């Protein structure tokens, strides 16, 4: 069995977990999440704990660890939630919230509007910062990657959209 899958997922107070064949639903104070679990993994809910184990074979042991990590992210998401911070670095690079989307000015001839999917909210503490919040870790990471993809940080001046905890490796300019 996977080392990750050996540890059970604790169910905190106020969280309700329902298991219907291979579909698991987790409901909490911040909302509810549903996910289909791989058929090679057996999931058992007992004594305020969720236990994952592989059905048989070595190749399915990795799937049990993945399922346990995904279920843990669901439990954390509906209780505490997740957030991802983006920074806009560059002259004239700005962001503002416009309805159900983020209005981005990133040095193009036109402003970009990135529509946010359901389950993700954004706020701009300053013009050069975006904070994405929600319950689904995968969805927040996907939206952050899409916004970063409009203008990824370049290695010479460091301009672009980057994650708050990202280190951009700088290059030296070509010399004559």
Curated annotation (Swiss-Prot):
Keyword annotations from UniProtKB, A to Z: Ribonucleoprotein, Ribosomal protein, RNA-binding, rRNA-binding
Pfam families: Ribosomal_L6 (PF00347)
Region listing for Disordered, in residue ranges: 151-176
Source taxon at top rank: Bacteria
UniProt GO molecular function: rRNA binding; structural constituent of ribosome
InterPro entries linked to this entry: Ribosomal_uL6-like, Ribosomal_uL6-like_a/b-dom_sf, Ribosomal_uL6_a/b-dom, Ribosomal_uL6_bac-type, Ribosomal_uL6_CS
One GO CC term, this protein: cytosolic large ribosomal subunit
GO biological process, one term: cytoplasmic translation
Biased amino acid composition, Basic and acidic residues: 151-170
Subunit organization: Part of the 50S ribosomal subunit.
Role noted for this protein: This protein binds to the 23S rRNA, and is important in its secondary structure. It is located near the subunit interface in the base of the L7/L12 stalk, and near the tRNA binding site of the peptidyltransferase center.
Family from the record: Belongs to the universal ribosomal protein uL6 family.
PANTHER family referenced in this protein's UniProt entry, alphabetically: 60S/50S RIBOSOMAL PROTEIN L6/L9, LARGE RIBOSOMAL SUBUNIT PROTEIN UL6M
Full protein name: Large ribosomal subunit protein uL6
Protein source organism: Shewanella piezotolerans (strain WP3 / JCM 13877)
Gene name in the database record: rplF
């Amino acid at each position: 069995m996977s080392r990750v899958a050996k540890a059970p997922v604790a169910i905190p107070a106020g969280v309700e977990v329902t298991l219907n064949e291979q579909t698991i639903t987790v409901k909490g104070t911040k909302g509810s999440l549903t996910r289909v679990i791989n058929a090679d993994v057996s999931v058992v809910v007992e004594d305020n704990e969720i236990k994952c184990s592989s059905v048989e074979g070595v190749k399915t042991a990795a799937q049990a660890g993945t399922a346990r990590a995904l279920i843990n992210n669901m439990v954390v998401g509906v209780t505490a939630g997740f957030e991802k911070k983006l920074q806009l670095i560059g002259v004239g690079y700005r962001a503002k919230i416009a309805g159900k989307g983020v209005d981005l000015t990133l040095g193009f001839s036109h402003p970009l509007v990135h529509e946010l999917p359901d389950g993700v909210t954004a706020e701009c503490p300053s013009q050069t910062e975006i904070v994405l919040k929600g319950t689904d870790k995968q969805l927040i990471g996907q939206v952050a990657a899409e916004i970063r993809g409009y203008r990824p940080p370049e290695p010479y001046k460091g301009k672009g959209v980057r994650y708050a905890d990202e280190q951009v490796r700088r290059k030296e300019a070509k010399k004559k």
